[in-house]
Curated annotation (Swiss-Prot):
Seems to be required for the assembly of the photosystem I complex. It comes from Lolium perenne. It is a multi-pass membrane protein. GO terms for cellular component: chloroplast thylakoid membrane; photosystem I. Coiled coil: none annotated. Keywords: Chloroplast, Membrane, Photosynthesis, Plastid, Thylakoid, Transmembrane, Transmembrane helix. Its main location: plastid. This is Photosystem I assembly protein Ycf4. The chain crosses the membrane at residues 20-40, 57-77. It is found in: Plastid, Chloroplast thylakoid membrane. GO terms for biological process: photosynthesis. The gene is ycf4.
């Protein structure tokens, strides 16, 4: 959801709570439980789950490897579930022409720097940059160049739903709102 008026533009960012992340976290969790149960079944010599026959699988080396894959999958799955729970990457971009201030806020991982908050003056914005990479894995990223701080990405690198036309339109609207030029590289 985005909100825009004559003097204020607020753009909310979704973060890691996306349908794809939920899907992959579930698939990875269930798959790693399957590997771990087959490894445990081969160690015990009994079928823990009747769907997965494990009498043909010897514990050493196949059962050990499957147990290792199961444990590794559980760790990766727990990492994904934690990023979803903490909603890492969500936040907002707020551009206020009336006060001349830009605020960028993002949630990170728990710790000292969980809240990433950047605030600077609009007059320090030099330009809006668009980075376009076509090919096998196309990327379109929108940056804001700040005097003395370099470039700050405004869109996530994994957002592939932007067509070139949508990216150009968003960059043009933002550059018009901020009254700065657009650069393409």
């Amino acid at each position: 959801m985005n909100w825009r008026s004559e003097h204020v533009w607020v753009e909310l960012l979704k973060g890691s709570r996306k349908r794809g992340n939920f899907f992959w976290a579930c698939i990875l969790f269930l798959g790693s439980l399957g590997f771990l149960s087959v490894g445990a079944s081969s160690y015990l010599g009994k079928n823990i789950i009747s769907i997965l026959p494990s009498q043909q699988i010897l514990f050493f080396p196949q059962g050990v490897v499957m147990s290792f894959y199961g444990i590794a999958g559980l760790f990766i799955s727990s990492y994904l579930w934690c990023t979803i729970l903490w909603n890492v990457g969500s936040g907002y971009d707020r551009f206020d022409r009336k006060e001349g201030i830009v605020c960028i806020f993002r949630w990170g991982f728990p710790g000292i720097k969980r809240r990433v908050f950047l605030q600077f003056l609009m007059r320090d914005i030099q330009s809006i940059r668009i980075q376009v990479k076509e090919g096998l894995s196309p990327r379109r990223i929108l940056y804001m160049e700040i005097r003395g701080q370099g470039v700050i990405p405004l869109t996530r690198t994994d957002e592939k739903f932007f067509t070139p036309r949508e990216m150009e339109q968003k960059a043009a609207e933002l550059a018009y709102f901020l009254r700065v030029p657009i650069e393409v590289f």
